[in-house]
Amino acid sequence: TQPDISALVEGHTDNMKVFNLGQIKDNWDLSVMRATQIVKLLLNSATIDAKRITASGRGEFFPLDPSNSDAAKKKNRRTEIILTPKLDELYQMLNEK
């Protein structure tokens, strides 16, 4: 456990529109649900403090590959985990050196 690090789990989608798949109304819903599933997996399988992890959705608005090919769409359907240190502690560490 790293008490000085938080995690942001971002869900992303491709640019194909989602049309009312039950709870999933659009790519925003899909991306949030994608991130939430990863957060639940992490919380169930690791000793992570739930207060230090956040799920968010980015929809189709941050593609890794903006082309419209099948390979690009596959690449854009993803989840990213971004680790963030406490900035005040990081700043202090940098100033000590």
Identify the function of each model-found stretch.
Residues 1-2, 12-94:
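Periplasmic OmpA-like peptidoglycan-binding domain that tethers envelope proteins to the cell wall
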Residues 97:
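Short, cationic low-complexity segments
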